[in-house]
Amino acid sequence: MPYVNIRVAGKLSREQKEEICRGVTEVIATVAQKPKETILIFIDEVDHENIGSAGKLLR
């Protein structure tokens, strides 16, 4: 059973999450030859203030 964990900075709409799930599921099913119903996708939304780059917080 494939597990895919996606972390994004900021918030996504429900529609964006659904589109990501559809697209990622299609790619994993095709490339890994796994049944779509076995693919789990986790989307973690992270506040910009909790992400650092080059020694500084994004916000």
PLM region descriptions:
Residues P2-R59:
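A domain-level signal for the structural core that forms small-molecule/cofactor-binding pockets
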